[in-house]
């Protein structure tokens, strides 16, 4: 039989929620996780016994706030000193420390202090999405397309790619979220002719606007703009601050230092925010929020809009910028497409609609799933899927920021302009600044400012061995090359000697080295083994518990009550009680110990129930072992048959 054809998945790695899709049999399937949810919280929790990812991690966040990590996307690819990281630290219950200028999350796991890079936390979420896909497909998954905000810079893209590698994925492509959403929107509108589409993507932590032209399966991005630090969580923060102040006013108590109270308040605020998208008022009821005080309050939609008014208004600036860069008037936009959960907020819809002079907004695609949908389509294209629907699909994306190098006086000389279609390659010739200069330092920057000090340094390298010559004579050719992932390589060549040097902006400071990624891959495998051992342990404990209660229940069944001699009944009851007491005191025992306890109980039960039925095995509850041979009565505990 031929092996199953390899498929690639599309993953929307979100700030607050993630989503995975696969393109099969001509259509995209968005996959539900083990809880039946089509989106999975981007949360990882560490306890004394196990590591939890997704729904399980988020649901215990209030009980374990300092070891429940979220928002890794707001840390990934950033420096610890980054002002946005410093402002976020105030809102996070978990500890973030600096190691060599890079942020690391410090938690307690199995009684030990551990520190993880944001890439490692994100890789755990990606592993969860990978497992979700594998459970659905029934085969291992190795290849994926992962999405990032269009405005993510080079280091954030590379760090996301590293996270994929740590999760054991071959990342086929990093694509921009609004572009992926545009694929989801445009795939079924092939015959509509050329259309200019504006994608307005406001998620849990990031905001993007992209202007595209879609025509006969060609998706050409004209311009992109955004804010990698604006989203639903910022609206939650405004609500949390508002209610914290109200609590202080009403009860003269400051709950800002109590992590558990803050987590419960944040969860209630998130729920209230969602309610306000469909109702004009939301109520918060939190029992014993802080120092035994119950907190009952309400908020109107108008008050919420006032609290966030500056944030809501700020979403229009990138819209104007993207239209300006695309050289399009707002009247030339055919479709305005909403993506991301935060676009459900009525005020944001109204602001956008008013900006476009009352035009209808397009809400035809699922805002939570559109990005994963588009990523799954792109994954199928890259794997060479022959389906007619994706056969001619062509994606032309752009570089979100200008790229250049520093020339005399700290001036930014741009080689690749922002919104240049990628992949792209640009070459320019430079020369020396002083006589007999033996080498040049190539410093690579991204950003839009005239001086390099105001832009972001990506990396630097030296080209040495230039023959002595007066200033202005040597010719140094510098080439900037961006691949389809938006990741940059820079080469410098001395024309007279042919001597060259190059840098791929991947192992620059703030990046993980190849060795670090490999170490993290090994550690991820170890965590997986630990997780499986924990699952086996829990299964063995549950099996023992179920068996004990099944035996106890059987003793009280009417049909058996009179058939079991009193001495045997007492013997079984005493043993059951002994096992239950042992269970109470050994919640963290090893799998083998649970199995040993079960075997001991079985040894006492087996002869008693065998005499009763005249058979070595007795059918009963499905959780307690193998079915006995046919013809035996269908009551009593299940005893596993031994060959």
Swiss-Prot record:
Keyword tags: ATP-binding, Methylation, Nucleotide-binding, Stress response
Binding annotation for ATP: 14-17, 73, 204-206, 270-277, 341-344
Region annotation Disordered: where it falls in the sequence: 620-643
Single Gene Ontology BP annotation: protein refolding
GO MF annotations, alphabetized: ATP binding; ATP hydrolysis activity; ATP-dependent protein folding chaperone; heat shock protein binding; protein folding chaperone
Residue numbers carrying N6,N6,N6-trimethyllysine: 563
Nucleotide-binding domain (NBD), as annotated region: 3-388
UniProt key word Lipoprotein: no
Pfam family, one: HSP70
Keyword Signal annotated: no
Region annotation (Substrate-binding domain (SBD)) ranges: 396-511
InterPro entries: ATPase_NBD, Heat_shock_70_CS, HSP70_C_sf, HSP70_peptide-bd_sf, Hsp_70_fam
GO cellular component, one term: cytosol
Record's note on what induces expression: By heat shock.
Family: Belongs to the heat shock protein 70 family.
Function text: Molecular chaperone implicated in a wide variety of cellular processes, including protection of the proteome from stress, folding and transport of newly synthesized polypeptides, activation of proteolysis of misfolded proteins and the formation and dissociation of protein complexes. Plays a pivotal role in the protein quality control system, ensuring the correct folding of proteins, the re-folding of misfolded proteins and controlling the targeting of proteins for subsequent degradation. This is achieved through cycles of ATP binding, ATP hydrolysis and ADP release, mediated by co-chaperones.
Domain notes: The N-terminal nucleotide binding domain (NBD) (also known as the ATPase domain) is responsible for binding and hydrolyzing ATP. The C-terminal substrate-binding domain (SBD) (also known as peptide-binding domain) binds to the client/substrate proteins. The two domains are allosterically coupled so that, when ATP is bound to the NBD, the SBD binds relatively weakly to clients. When ADP is bound in the NBD, a conformational change enhances the affinity of the SBD for client proteins.
Name the record gives this protein: Heat shock 70 kDa protein 6
Source organism: Sus scrofa
Encoding gene, per UniProt annotation: HSPA6
């Amino acid at each position: 039989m031929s092996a199953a054809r390899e498929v690639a998945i599309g993953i929307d790695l979100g700030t607050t929620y993630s989503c995975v899709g696969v393109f099969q049999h001509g259509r995209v399937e968005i996959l539900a996780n083990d809880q039946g949810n089509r989106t999975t919280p981007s949360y990882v929790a560490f306890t004394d016994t196990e590591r939890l990812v997704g729904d399980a991690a988020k649901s215990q966040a209030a009980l374990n706030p300092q070891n429940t990590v979220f928002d890794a996307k707001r840390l990934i690819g950033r420096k610890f000193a980054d002002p946005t990281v410093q402002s976020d630290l105030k809102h996070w219950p978990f500890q973030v420390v600096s190691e060599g200028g890079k942020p690391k999350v410090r938690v307690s796991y199995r009684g030990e202090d551990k520190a993880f890079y944001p890439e490692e936390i994100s890789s755990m979420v990606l592993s969860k999405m990978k497992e979700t896909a594998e459970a659905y497909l029934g085969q291992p998954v190795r290849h994926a397309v992962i999405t990032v905000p269009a405005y993510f810079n080079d280091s954030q893209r590379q760090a996301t790619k590293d996270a994929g590698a740590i999760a054991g994925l071959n990342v086929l492509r990093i694509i921009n979220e609004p572009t992926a959403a545009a694929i989801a929107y445009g795939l079924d509108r092939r015959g509509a002719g050329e259309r200019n589409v504006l994608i307005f993507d406001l998620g849990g932590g990031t905001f993007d606007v992209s202007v595209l032209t879609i025509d006969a399966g060609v998706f050409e991005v004209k311009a992109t703009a955004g804010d990698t630090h604006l989203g639903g969580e910022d609206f939650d923060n405004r609500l949390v601050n508002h209610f914290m102040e109200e609590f202080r006013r009403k009860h003269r108590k400051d709950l800002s230092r109590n992590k558990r109270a803050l987590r419960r308040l944040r969860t209630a605020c998130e729920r209230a925010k969602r309610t306000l998208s469909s109702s004009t008022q939301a109520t918060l009821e939190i029992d014993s929020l802080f120092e035994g005080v119950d907190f009952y309050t309400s908020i109107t939609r108008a008050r919420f809009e006032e609290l966030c008014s500056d944030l809501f208004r700020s979403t229009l600036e990138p819209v104007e910028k993207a239209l300006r860069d695309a050289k399009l008037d707002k009247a030339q936009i055919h479709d305005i497409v909403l993506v991301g959960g935060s676009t459900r907020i009525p005020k944001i819809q109204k602001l956008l609609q008013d900006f476009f002079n009352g035009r209808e907004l397009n809400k035809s695609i699922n805002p939570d799933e559109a990005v994963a949908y588009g990523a799954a389509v792109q994954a199928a294209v890259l794997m060479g899927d022959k389906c007619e629907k994706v056969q001619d699909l062509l994606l032309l994306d752009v570089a979100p920021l200008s790229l250049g190098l520093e020339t005399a006086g700290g001036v930014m000389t741009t080689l690749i302009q922002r919104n240049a279609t990628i992949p792209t390659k640009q070459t320019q010739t430079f020369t020396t600044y002083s006589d007999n200069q033996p080498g040049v330092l190539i410093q690579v920057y991204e950003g839009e400012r005239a001086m390099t000090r105001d832009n972001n340094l990506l990396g630097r390298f030296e080209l040495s061995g230039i023959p002595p010559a007066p200033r202005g004579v040597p010719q140094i050719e510098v080439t900037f090359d961006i691949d389809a992932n938006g990741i940059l390589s820079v080469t410098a060549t001395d024309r007279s000697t042919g001597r060259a040097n190059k840098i791929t902006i991947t192992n620059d400071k703030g990046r993980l080295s190849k060795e670090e990624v490999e170490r993290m891959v090994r550690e991820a495998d170890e965590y997986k083994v630990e997780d499986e051992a924990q699952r086996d342990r829990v299964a063995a404990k549950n099996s023992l518990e179920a068996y004990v209660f099944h035996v106890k229940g059987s003793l009280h069944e009417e049909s058996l009550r009179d058939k079991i001699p009193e001495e045997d009944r007492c013997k079984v009851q005493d043993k059951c009680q002994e096992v239950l007491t042992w269970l109470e005191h050994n919640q963290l025992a090893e799998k083998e110990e649970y199995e040993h306890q079960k075997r001991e109980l079985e040894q006492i039960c087996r002869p008693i129930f065998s005499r009763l039925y005249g058979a070595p095995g007795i059918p009963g509850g499905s959780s307690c072992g193998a079915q006995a041979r046919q013809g035996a009565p269908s009551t009593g505990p299940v005893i596993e048959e031994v060959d």
